[in-house]
Amino acid sequence: MNWWIDQYKQYHAQLSTNYPGNSLKPQLHHIVDLVKDTKSETLLDYGCGKGLQYTKWKHHEELGVMPSLYDPAVPEYEELPSGPFDGIYSTDVMEHIPREHLPEIFNNIFSRADKFVFLAICTKPAIATLPSGENAHCTVESIEFWKTMVEKYAPKRVYTHIKTYGTCNNYSILNEELYLEWYLSQF
């Protein structure tokens, strides 16, 4: 995985506009709804890029809370916070991770999430090319693949929303009964 992260560190360093954090905005309404529905107070943006979605564009104001930030290719966010977090979201990240590293990534995410996980995943090749010449989207798969990965590798069951876009536009909710149990316990 270190080779892959090094590729992204080089890519980030090439231009200040590479992965600034602009993949959050198209998904923000889904995440805001999840934060409100689950009354989440602690969040983690897993794969935040350079973080401009918070420092410049102030998207956290819509969330009602400033999330913790993690991106292994950005020096100021390279330390994975231990959590736990009420909610964890990742937008335009999973498709950048080599298939053989997905079990580790799902463990990192799902072991830290208490109320929800939201994954927005692109299902077509990227415009971006890494310094090695490889396409930045190395795991381009349908929503069924991603659902199977969550079911197989998440160390615990968490209320999960998966949105895919690109060549496979879909939305799926996993473990909805966990949310319903929690919701009903609020009364």
Sequence positions of predicted segments:
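A short SAM/SAH-binding and catalytic strip from SAM-dependent methyltransferases
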Residues: 89-100
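Substrate-binding/catalytic groove segments of enzymes
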Residues: 156-157
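Short "lid" loop at the C-terminus of a central beta-strand within the Rossmann-like core
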Residues: 122-128
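Conserved N-terminal segment of class I S-adenosyl-L-methionine
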Residues: 1-87, 103-106, 112, 123, ...
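Short glycine-centered segments of the SAM/dcSAM-binding site in methyltransferase folds
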Residues: 115-118
